[in-house]
């Protein structure tokens, strides 16, 4: 019998602040930005809020929402890829305000028509993340309207002027200042902000930023990571949380990866339990499994969706995935130990892995178990270009890898032990899940993997209209309007 792993127990406590910083890191990678972009934006936003005379409670909202502003980016990455081809470079062009970034949208009905559904996904997911982390309701509200503008041309609800939460204006301006100053220099950045006065955000905030921006940016460049942490944390972000939400946000980037990180974590913990009674080791490998895919956000979806061998340029991006996971741990406090272990997920005993090309003795037992678990879960999962391997075929593949000296034989047998049953963390919110019928859960699982209503109908032998009815019922019962949030909630309830 395999153990049930609780990420809340036995670790260095994971604060909400640590989780928020990890999610900020993922968001920055998704947007093609430096990995301190969201933290710097948060600091600038807090200074702007204080200088503008905004009350202390709203200043805390600014701090929390600014770091989670891009937390919905993995959820709509597939949509950006469908429109632009490369979901990351297109976002860089958007943030930098390049005049040509909207050209592909004109033939598709215009900016609003194309971006409205993508903004809806992003805002609903980031708001849901704030709710799941226990942050203030005002933070959730700000994130659900993070792309609204002063002139009413924002998204998703086209709010305007005083109906837009004030933190949205502050965060939007601070984010623009951070990007523009870094890209074009301070003087031009202030000119670009002035052009957006009373369209994107109120003139009074632009005027305040213009007075202080040069000194703020100079001060910001001199701050240590500890200084940034002290300036950005709030009382709600001191609460304890677990790493499962990070795993779920990671996996939203590619619908066919839904549940992958949790499955790797559970498989690794179960395999570890077969090799050592050390419960601390079980928990370490479990948390590492949850976050091992953080760096995946740095690679465009069109690379991940390639059915054939990757060209060298794409392969180089993939090889850096565990590096970015390791870097996230340096920024995210209590996740440091887990990220160090997680960054070994793709190493191999013969030195053919990445990113370190580590060998033999350099790889701990936990690293070997994690590597075998990633391979096992990947083989047993369907991909757009292939069906899932059968248990026997996947087991043979793992044993062949061990025989060739790439994977550890003991780790492989531990992962395959007892029919490779995996542990599952006790789900939360089961009362919500109990309201869904068995057929609704079937439909929910299918749409969480990215299946269209037509594909779900074929898979479950239902009519498209029946599937649509089930989807509408699922959304109503889960109180959401997007598949991404339905997936987050279903995963938290243990339904996937």
Put a short name on every predicted segment:
Residues 489-496:
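Intrinsically disordered, low-complexity basic tails/linkers immediately adjacent to helix-turn-helix/homeobox/MYB/SANT
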Residues 441-442:
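Pre-recognition alpha-helix immediately N-terminal to the DNA-recognition helix
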């Amino acid at each position: 019998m395999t153990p049930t792993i609780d990420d809340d127990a036995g670790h260095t406590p994971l604060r909400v602040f640590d989780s928020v910083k990890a999610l900020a890191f993922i968001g920055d990678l998704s947007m093609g930005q430096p990995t301190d972009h969201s933290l710097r934006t948060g600091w600038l936003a807090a200074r702007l809020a204080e200088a503008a005379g905004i009350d202390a409670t709203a200043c805390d909202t600014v701090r929390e929402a600014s770091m989670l502003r891009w937390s919905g980016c993995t959820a709509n990455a597939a949509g950006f890829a469908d429109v632009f081809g490369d979901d990351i470079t297109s976002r860089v062009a958007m943030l930098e305000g390049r005049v040509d970034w909207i050209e592909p949208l004109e033939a598709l009905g215009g900016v609003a028509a194309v971006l409205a559904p993508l903004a809806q996904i992003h805002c609903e997911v980031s708001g849901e993340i704030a709710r799941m982390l226990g942050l203030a309701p005002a933070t959730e509200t700000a994130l659900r309207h993070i792309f609204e503008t002063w002139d009413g041309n924002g998204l998703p609800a086209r709010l305007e002027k005083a109906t837009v939460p004030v933190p949205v204006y502050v965060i939007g301006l601070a984010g623009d200042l951070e990007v523009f100053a870094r890209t074009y220099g301070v003087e031009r950045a202030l000119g670009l902000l002035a052009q957006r006065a009373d369209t994107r955000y109120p003139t009074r905030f632009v005027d305040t930023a213009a007075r202080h921006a040069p000194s703020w940016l100079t001060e910001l460049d001199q701050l240590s990571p500890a200084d940034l942490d002290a300036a950005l944390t709030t009382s709600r972000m001191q609460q304890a949380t677990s790493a499962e939400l990070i795993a779920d946000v990671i996996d939203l980037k590619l619908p066919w990866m839904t549940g992958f990180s949790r499955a790797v974590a559970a498989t690794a913990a179960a395999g570890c339990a077969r090799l050592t009674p050390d419960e601390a080791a079980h928990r370490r490998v479990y948390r590492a499994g949850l976050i091992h895919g953080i760096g995946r956000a740095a690679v465009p979806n069109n690379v991940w969706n390639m059915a054939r061998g990757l060209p060298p340029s794409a392969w180089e991006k993939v090889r850096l995935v565990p590096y970015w996971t390791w870097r996230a741990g340096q920024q995210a406090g209590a996740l440091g130990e887990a990220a160090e272990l997680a960054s070994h997920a793709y190493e191999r005993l013969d030195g053919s892995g990445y990113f370190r090309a580590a060998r033999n003795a350099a790889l701990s037992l936990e690293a070997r178990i994690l590597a075998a678990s990633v391979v096992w879960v990947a083989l047993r999962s369907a991909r757009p270009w292939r069906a899932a391997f059968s248990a026997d075929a996947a087991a043979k593949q793992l044993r062949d890898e061990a025989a060739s000296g790439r994977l550890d034989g003991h780790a492989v047998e531990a992962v395959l032990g007892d029919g490779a049953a995996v542990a599952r963390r006790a789900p939360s919110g089961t009362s919500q899940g109990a309201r869904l019928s068995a057929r609704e859960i079937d439909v929910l699982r299918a749409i969480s993997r990215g299946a269209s209503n037509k594909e779900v109908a074929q898979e479950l032998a239902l009519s498209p209209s029946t599937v649509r009815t089930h989807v509408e019922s699922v959304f109503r019962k889960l109180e959401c309007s997007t598949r991404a949030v339905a997936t987050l909630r279903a995963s938290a309830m243990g339904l996937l």
